[in-house]
């Protein structure tokens, strides 16, 4: 077999092994795990009452000077699960009305516990319900943020807690132009005032004030927490982090299972942030950048249900008689949009909250992965073209062209070397005939020919090898960025981040059957139109080189496009479109370079030979 064919086969097999490993360690386990979690969660919601949590964090301050508070108890108690609407109606509320958020603030406890993201729907159907981020205590999956004060050790003053009923100062909804003001008097000389503001995106600003008209000073610790009841379903498996996250003297990531084992982890940091992240959505506490934090990640089991919490305490403040104190906090609760969160990358132009608030690596809320140096610029390129064409599918096609142009010098050298390999095939064949039984002599003479002709025998692997990190980086962009979620292409592709919805095995919808639901093998039966197109383009790419004489190698060449077609069938449609388009460009590029080097392009001759053999 010709050396360029051997190199191509080697590169293809390498890619295939990577894809097989990817399928085995990610796709199939993730699907099985997700199904199991869905079943377990459904049973759990039927049989297990859900807890409500108190508003007190469990971190114990270690600052010097002031008396220390005792560690607050979890204070959780079980109660029956109620419908979300019923739980919302059970307490007086202040409505939240912004271009991106709809919901309410509970006056009982002063919690932000009702947040829906109105610009995002559960499915591609625009009439489907909006994504619900926060839900009140007592529902199936409580998730909320709370702010307040913790007393120092020895302080017995009554402070607002989860049961406190605040009063709204004034009336009306919380909007980007009208903050909500809450107030409460403990009847013992302390009055509390909370001003909550919200911007046009996903940022809440909370200003807590306490005034002391009593007969003794009090020392208090400002706190903030995010609490989430029940273990969420995770979709990323190993490809992205879902769980507790923060930047606390370095990036801290704890998956739910990991924090279940650790129970509680404490941190000290300045200019930090912390919260919980899902694939597309997140909730994060953003203290003042100059604040000294005593932060904590924790998991507290009540029966079979775990309550996950991220919280922090600030340095204590002493409120003198006749004096007052203020604590400021910020809360991000929304979609992980790159332009809103921010991208820390040269010339990115997406400062977002990361730059606006001078936060410490808040862009890491989006998991760009190990190949971030490729993933970030790839996303920026896709986003750039999207702003012009309004379609991420077109952006993928154009970015692929840009990538091809960037790597053209290397590909040109590689394909030129392959073209030279074709030109010396008669010499290599003569060597085999001259030294039929002396493989060592064959190799020595062959390497001498390579040296004389300045040919790199492994150059044919480079185009495919280079494509692998680009492939995974694009997969990462499609998988983790909210911008790609439910982004349509043309025709039947309504979501580039999901597999092609058509399926050959049910005759593209004519038969009422979903083959992908078949256990274990269902993922490989998601054979839509675009995977078939990708397989055809790969088959053309393989036919660009002559068929190798060895029967085993012929079989590899013939079966590889079909194998890749099935392996890529369950991948996001955007990735399959990229692969098909990249194959097409590779065929055109290789043909151009071969012609320029005076080598005949044998694509059509090889196709004719293939069909001629089948005809006979």
Swiss-Prot record:
Organism: Bradyrhizobium diazoefficiens (strain JCM 10833 / BCRC 13528 / IAM 13628 / NBRC 14792 / USDA 110)
Membrane topology: Multi-pass membrane protein
Biased amino acid composition, Polar residues: 44-71
GO CC annotations on file: plasma membrane
GO MF assignments: membrane insertase activity
Family annotation (HAMAP family): YidC_type1
UniProt-annotated stretches for the region Disordered: 37-80
Subcellular location: Cell inner membrane
GO biological process entries: protein insertion into membrane; protein transport
Record-annotated disulphide pairs: none
Domain of life: Bacteria
Coiled-coil residues: none
Membrane-spanning parts: 9-29, 388-408, 462-482, 520-540, 559-579
Protein name listed in UniProt: Membrane protein insertase YidC
């Amino acid at each position: 077999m010709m050396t360029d064919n051997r190199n191509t086969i080697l590169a293809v097999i390498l890619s295939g092994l990577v894809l097989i490993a990817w399928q085995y360690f990610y796709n199939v386990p993730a699907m099985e795990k997700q199904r199991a979690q869905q079943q377990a969660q459904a049973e759990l919601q039927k049989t297990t009452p859900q807890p409500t949590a108190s508003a007190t964090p469990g971190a114990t301050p270690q600052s010097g000077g002031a008396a220390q508070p005792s560690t607050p108890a979890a204070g959780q108690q079980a109660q029956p699960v109620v419908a979300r609407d019923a739980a919302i109606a059970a307490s007086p509320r202040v409505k939240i009305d912004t271009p991106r958020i709809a919901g309410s603030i509970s006056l009982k406890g002063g919690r932000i516990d009702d947040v829906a993201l109105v610009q995002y729907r559960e499915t591609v159907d625009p009439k489907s319900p909006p994504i619900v981020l926060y839900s009140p205590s007592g529902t199936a999956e409580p998730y909320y943020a709370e702010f307040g004060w913790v007393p120092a050790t020895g302080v017995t003053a009554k402070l607002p807690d989860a049961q406190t009923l605040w009063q709204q100062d004034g009336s009306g909804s919380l909007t980007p132009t009208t903050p909500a003001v809450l107030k409460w008097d403990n009847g013992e000389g302390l009055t509390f005032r909370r001003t909550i503001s919200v911007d046009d995106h996903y940022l809440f600003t909370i200003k807590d004030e306490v005034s002391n008209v009593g007969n003794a000073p009090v020392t208090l610790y400002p706190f903030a927490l995010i609490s989430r009841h029940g273990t969420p379903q995770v979709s990323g498996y190993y490809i992205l982090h879902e769980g507790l996250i923060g930047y606390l003297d370095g990036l801290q990531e704890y998956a739910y299972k990991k924090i279940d084992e650790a129970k509680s982890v404490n941190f000290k940091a300045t200019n930090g942030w912390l919260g919980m992240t899902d694939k597309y959505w997140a909730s994060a506490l953003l203290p003042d950048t100059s604040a000294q934090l005593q932060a904590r990640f924790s998991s507290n089991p009540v029966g079979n249900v775990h309550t996950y919490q991220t919280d922090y305490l600030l340095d204590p403040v002493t409120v003198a008689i006749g004096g007052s104190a203020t604590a400021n906090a910020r809360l991000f609760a929304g979609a992980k949009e790159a332009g809103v969160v921010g991208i820390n990358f040269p010339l990115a132009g997406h400062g977002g909250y990361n730059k606006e608030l001078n936060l410490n690596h808040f862009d890491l809320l989006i998991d760009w992965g190990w190949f971030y140096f490729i993933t970030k610029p790839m996303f920026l390129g896709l986003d750039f073209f999207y702003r012009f064409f309004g379609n991420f599918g077109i952006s993928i096609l154009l970015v692929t062209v840009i990538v091809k142009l960037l790597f053209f010098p290397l590909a040109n050298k590689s394909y030129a070397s392959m073209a030279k390999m074709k030109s010396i095939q008669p010499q290599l064949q003569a060597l085999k005939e001259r030294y039929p039984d002396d493989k060592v002599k064959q190799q020595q003479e062959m390497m001498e020919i390579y040296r004389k002709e300045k040919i790199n025998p492994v150059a044919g692997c480079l185009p495919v090898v280079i494509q692998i990190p680009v492939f995974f980086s694009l997969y990462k962009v499609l998988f983790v960025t909210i911008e790609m979620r439910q982004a349509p292409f043309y025709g039947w592709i309504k979501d580039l981040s999901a597999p092609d919805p058509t399926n050959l095995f049910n005759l593209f919808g004519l038969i009422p059957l979903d083959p992908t639901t078949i256990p274990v093998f269902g993922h490989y039966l998601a054979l839509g139109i675009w995977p078939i197109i990708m397989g055809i383009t790969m088959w053309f790419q393989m036919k660009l080189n002559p068929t190798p004489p060895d029967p085993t190698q012929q079989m590899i060449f013939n079966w590889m496009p079909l194998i890749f077609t099935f392996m890529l069938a369950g991948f996001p449609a955007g990735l399959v479109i990229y692969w098909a388009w990249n194959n097409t460009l590779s065929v055109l590029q290789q043909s151009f370079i071969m012609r320029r080097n005076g080598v005949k392009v044998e694509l059509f001759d090889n196709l004719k030979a293939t069909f001629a053999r089948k005809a006979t």
